[in-house]
């Protein structure tokens, strides 16, 4: 399900599994000037992706991250837009398939009411987002996530939200993505999801590349879930150490025979990720990804297609999982 309606599996094409169109990171105050709030810039940057052959984007902007509490998103008649409607508008304008996520990000970004809600109540809210519409709109979510955790562990309230996400995933059948940075908490998240009965083949652990341990990546993949290297635009701007480390980790996954569990994306979440401001944008992978990865680690065109076409399709649809 995209923000403009259902599509078939063969319409997914080249897919970025973890991006953001509009994003409010004001709770991390040091990022205040850098969050994604400019519809004109969003259109320009997304059009670059479309023009480069990009077809689908999964926008994992969950509750707490949505740019809807500030009067910054408008339609052509200057009417204030809710986040989901603003994403729908840019999808219509560019022709990109945008699949919008739901749920809640991480504890720092939760609304106070979540502490008073039971697990099943939170789950039902996510189910409504998928089956009816997000935040009172008719724009339906087609994905659950990103569902986050702190840097080294899952807090008690984050576990409640994660269990709710698991129950919503089972009821709706859409794929689920977690947020796990610079630590091994992705395995703890998988433990919780699998305890609730979620098929790990419908789960992607985001930001896996930020924890540079092959053993961690291999364990995620061996359980059946997907490893997401989703700051790939950084290959354009990374220092030599980070550049070589990322390439080494990717090659280790492929050499271990785990390519069917590997996903790439850019996680555009700051204005400085835009091409306009020197970043890789949404189009680095579609314009330069294969060339860079072939030169550095010998990635073939067939392998690149597996990562950018086949793997996202299996995650999102469950077909051939």
Regions found by a protein language model. Give the residues of each.
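Short acidic/histidine-rich active-site segments
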Residues: 176-177, 230-231, 258-279, 304
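Active-site gating/metal-coordination segments in enzymes
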Residues: 89-93, 97-172, 226, 232-235
